[in-house]
Curated annotation (Swiss-Prot):
It comes from the Eukaryota. Keywords: Initiation factor, Protein biosynthesis, RNA-binding, Translation regulation. GO terms for biological process: regulation of translation. This is Eukaryotic translation initiation factor 4E type 3. It comes from Xenopus tropicalis (Western clawed frog).
Length: 218
């Protein structure tokens, strides 16, 4: 599915429970979309933007409470409106993350719709983070990974996390048992041939020692 270029800034009016509430000055004032997401070119499925902050030693409840829903997009136009109105990755403070998840699932390992899946995880140079994040977003909502997964699997989300020396990106899938049939990494390398990825690996959620903790992991 080819996506048109970003249109001029259109603002959507999010429903009350979709608004992002930030109390951190370093993120600045978020320009919220202003108009209902009812028109435009529909996406194959809705996708939800999330924001959170990951801190070492926090409890499961604290991890989930740090998770903020930004907006659920249903069209290409609403995707661009949200993308253009949230801070760029380069403006996020250390240990903050963006996620885009299929439907309204949360970026939590133990979420029922995620629990049997896993992530491809890789480090990227900070100067490449914004480009990598944008390209992965477009590939994800454009369903460019569909034929790179097993028939009984799909990509269900992407994440970018700001870290000290290098940032981290993750691509989530729903069925870790068939990951051997996937060529998702090859597609990522095709999309971003000039990016130097490091520490690239796949890990099922259930193999994490803290899997039962119910935390957001990135």
């Amino acid at each position: 599915m080819a996506l048109p270029a970003a249109p001029a800034d259109r603002r959507l009016q999010p429903e009350p429970d979709e608004q992002l509430h930030l109390n951190h000055r370093e993120l600045g004032e978020l320009a919220l979309p202003q108009e209902p997401d009812t028109e435009g070119i529909p996406l194959h499925s809705p996708w939800t933007f999330w924001l959170d902050r990951s801190l070492p030693g926090t409890t499961a409840a604290e991890c989930e409470s740090n998770l903020k829903k930004i907006y659920t997009v249903h069209t290409i136009q609403s995707f661009w409106s949200v993308y253009n109105n949230i801070p760029q990755v380069t403006n996020l403070p250390l240990r903050w993350s963006y996620h885009l998840m299929r439907g309204e699932r949360k970026p939590l390992w133990e979420e029922e719709s995620n629990a049997k899946g896993g992530v491809w995880k890789m480090k990227v140079p900070k100067e490449a983070s914004s480009l990598v994040w944008k390209e992965l977003l477009l590939a994800t909502i454009g369903e460019q990974f569909t034929d790179r997964c097993a028939p009984e699997d799909e990509v269900i989300g992407v994440s970018v996390s700001v870290r000290d020396r290098e940032d981290v990106v993750q691509v989530w899938n729903g069925n870790a048992s068939v990951v051997g049939e996937a060529t998702v990494l090859e597609k990522i390398y095709e999309l971003l041939p000039n990016t130097s990825f490091k520490a690239v690996f796949y890990k099922p959620h259930e193999e994490h020692h803290a899997f039962e903790g119910g935390r957001s992991r990135h």
